Amino acid sequence: MTNIRKTHPLLKIINHSFIDLPAPSNISSWWNFGSLLGICLMIQILTGLFLAMHYTSDTMTAFSSVTHICRDVNYGWLIRYLHANGASMFFICLFLHVGRGMYYGSYTFMETWNIGVILLFAVMATAFMGYVLPWGQMSFWGATVITNLLSAIPYIGTTLVEWIWGGFSVDKATLTRFFAFHFILPFIIAALVIVHLLFLHETGSNNPTGLNSEADKIPFHPYYTIKDILGVLMMVSFLMTLVLFFPDLLGDPDNYMPANPLNTPPHIKPEWYFLFAYAILRSIPNKLGGVLALILSILILALLPFLHTSKQRSLMFRPITQTLYWILVANLLVLTWIGGQPVEHPFIIIGQLASISYFSIILILMPISGIIEDKMLKWNL
């Protein structure tokens, strides 16, 4: 008798995706982040659902409803901090997942990669709107500053901003719609994740060598299920340490003050995971130019398949491009640091140099190094 998991219409989809899926035998721990992101998404949806049961999306009561969750709801403080720090965990895994894709040339799976870029934008939008909901000082001013960037769009900018605000400033209407979008987007993300996996399973996974692994596949279960469980345990341990010992480490103290439109905080800055993009935005003196650079800093990922010049897929055997890659990583850390600093000397010039090098490495230096490496190998294939 054939096993039910191979015949049942629903179970066989799960079987082909997580049990009998042929996977390359040599994928390293860098391939764990997909499953970790799935766990992060589930944690965020569940904690978010319980928070939404007690939260009110009204300017008069939003801040106090979050206080009520932390003080009066059973384990409300735990749910709230799991949700807030879960977002940070989500972005840590996201950046590592994207970094893995860049290093090993996974972007050559065009459909999977492009859905991934859309997912990144969707997660960033969700996180931004979620940061507005507690209605603290940084929530209000962050929302004001970031939505105001749209006014840089010629002709329709001002109208567009007022349409998004639902008035002439960030107010009750803005908070209500941000809550609605923040609630619905994770489910759209979950649907996109399924499409992401669908396209991935059409081609099969990449592997560290970047070579074809058709000749040597192993079943996903038990080999990679047990490996994923180890990754999940490590991530959850890290998350719980963060939540139980340092819950406010990654937050902004200003957000413990209720939103006040009459009092601007000394340094308006987003959450840590947006600081690199914020630094790029601020490094350009022109408003429209800054907005374009901000969007391009993420959208540039969609160009990677077209910027790949090497005959090798992975960076595993390409020392010059490897060096450039790690310089890029260091550069992103510098941008993240600059994004959290005030706009004054020497931070302005450091931010501008880091922004120029960010785009230069991806658009110019990496494609050139790919050609040089091929020439050095005398590959005339």
UniProtKB/Swiss-Prot annotation:
Coiled coil: none
Single GO BP term: mitochondrial electron transport, ubiquinol to cytochrome c
Cellular-component GO terms for this entry: mitochondrial inner membrane; respiratory chain complex III
CDD domains, sorted: cytochrome_b_C (cd00290), Cytochrome_b_N (cd00284)
Topological type in the membrane: Multi-pass membrane protein
Quaternary structure and interacting proteins, as annotated: The cytochrome bc1 complex contains 11 subunits: 3 respiratory subunits (MT-CYB, CYC1 and UQCRFS1), 2 core proteins (UQCRC1 and UQCRC2) and 6 low-molecular weight proteins (UQCRH/QCR6, UQCRB/QCR7, UQCRQ/QCR8, UQCR10/QCR9, UQCR11/QCR10 and a cleavage product of UQCRFS1). This cytochrome bc1 complex then forms a dimer.
An example Gene Ontology molecular-function term: ubiquinol-cytochrome-c reductase activity
Binding site for heme b b562: H83, H182
Keyword Hydrolase on entry: no
Compartment list: Mitochondrion inner membrane
Family of the protein in this entry: Belongs to the cytochrome b family.
UniProt-listed InterPro entries: Cyt_b/b6_C (IPR005798), Cyt_b/b6_C_sf (IPR036150), Cyt_b/b6_N (IPR005797), Cytb/b6-like_sf (IPR027387), Cytochrome_b (IPR030689), Cytochrome_b_C_euk/bac (IPR048260), Cytochrome_b_N_euk/bac (IPR048259), Di-haem_cyt_TM (IPR016174)
Protein's job: Component of the ubiquinol-cytochrome c reductase complex (complex III or cytochrome b-c1 complex) that is part of the mitochondrial respiratory chain. The b-c1 complex mediates electron transfer from ubiquinol to cytochrome c. Contributes to the generation of a proton gradient across the mitochondrial membrane that is then used for ATP synthesis.
UniProt-listed Pfam families: Cytochrom_B_C, Cytochrome_B
Domain of life: Eukaryota
Source organism per UniProt: Apodemus flavicollis (Yellow-necked field mouse)
Cofactor binding, per record: Binds 2 heme b groups non-covalently.
Protein name (record): Cytochrome b
Keyword Chloroplast listed: no
Spans traversing the lipid bilayer: 33-53, 77-98, 113-133, 178-198, 226-246, 288-308, 320-340, 347-367
